[in-house]
Regions:
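Transmembrane helix-loop junctions in multi-pass membrane proteins
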Residues: 46-53, 103-105, 127-137
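Membrane-helix interface motif
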Residues: 43-59, 192-202
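Perimembrane loop-to-helix junctions flanking transmembrane segments
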Residues: 15, 52-70
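N-terminal juxtamembrane cytosolic/stromal segments of multi-pass membrane proteins
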Residues: 1-37
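Terminal transmembrane helical module of multi-pass membrane proteins
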Residues: 130-207
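Alpha-helical transmembrane segments of multipass membrane proteins
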Residues: 36-41, 85-89, 121, 125, ...
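Alpha-helical transmembrane segments with an aromatic anchor "belt"
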Residues: 65-131
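Membrane-interface helix-boundary motifs at transmembrane edges
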Residues: 21-25, 101-109, 163-173
Length: 207
C-alpha cells in the first residue's frame, strides 16, 4: 500500500511522464477508480431514492414501484457498468494507437500504464466523492464525479491526439480518424453501460 501511495503521488505530480513502473500499480489504480466510482453512484442512488422519492411515496403509495429496487443485482450492474466505462477509455486509446497509427509496440500493458498515470486525479476525486456519497453529501459527490468523468475523457483525448512517431497519415486526417474510431468504441460500450444502469439514472433525474 505504501508503494502504491508513492506511485500515486508521482502520478499526480507528473501524469504524462513515461515511467516504467510495477504493473500492479496500474491495476490497483483502475480497480480503485472503478470501486470508488461505483460506490459513489450506488450510495447517491440509494440516498436519493430514500430521501426525495421516499417523501413522494408518502403521497402516492405506488410511486416507488416505478423505480428499480436496490439489491445485490443493482450492485453488480453498477460495478460492471463502471468497469465498462473505464475499460472503454482504455480500449479507445488502444484501438487508435494500434489500427490508426499502426503502432505495434502499443500493447494493452503500455496503454494501461499510460492511462493509469493520467487517471491519478480521478482516483483521488472519486475516493473523496465516495466518502461524501456514503454520508449523504450528494451534491458535492455528484460534482466530484462529474469532474472526474471530465478528466477521464480529457485523458482519453490526450492519448488519442498524440500521433505515434511512425504515423504516415496527415496530422489532420489522422486526428479526424482517431476521433471517429475512438468515438465508435466509446459509443458501443456506452450502449452496454446504459442497458445496465439506465433505470438507476432515472432515480437521479430529479435529485
Amino acid at each position: 500500500m505504501a508503494d502504491f501511495w508513492v506511485w500515486l503521488q508521482g502520478a499526480l505530480k507528473e501524469p504524462t511522464a513515461s515511467i516504467d513502473t510495477d504493473k500492479k500499480h496500474s491495476y490497483n489504480a483502475f480497480a480503485l477508480l472503478t470501486i470508488f466510482s461505483a460506490t459513489s453512484f450506488l450510495f447517491t442512488v440509494y440516498h436519493a431514492k430514500q430521501g426525495y422519492y421516499g417523501r413522494m411515496a408518502s403521497i402516492d403509495a405506488h410511486f416507488m414501484e416505478q423505480f428499480p429496487s436496490l439489491n445485490l443485482f443493482s450492485v453488480f450492474s453498477i460495478l460492471v457498468a463502471t468497469s465498462l466505462f473505464f475499460f472503454s477509455i482504455l480500449m479507445g486509446g488502444f484501438v487508435v494507437k494500434r489500427f490508426v497509427d499502426q503502432d505495434s509496440d502499443w500493447t494493452l500493458e503500455k496503454a494501461l500504464q499510460a492511462h493509469s498515470r493520467l487517471l491519478a486525479i480521478p482516483v483521488l476525486l472519486t475516493g473523496i466523492a465516495s466518502f461524501f456519497a456514503l454520508f449523504n453529501g450528494l451534491r458535492f459527490a455528484v460534482l466530484l464525479c462529474l469532474i472526474s468523468i471530465g478528466l477521464t475523457l480529457l485523458a482519453n483525448l490526450y492519448i488519442i491526439s498524440r500521433p505515434s512517431k511512425d504515423s504516415q497519415i496527415d496530422s489532420f486526417y489522422r486526428l479526424l480518424l482517431a476521433f471517429l474510431v475512438n468515438g465508435g468504441v466509446l459509443f458501443l460500450f456506452f450502449l452496454a453501460e446504459m442497458a445496465l444502469v439506465f433505470d438507476y439514472l432515472r432515480i437521479l433525474a430529479f435529485m
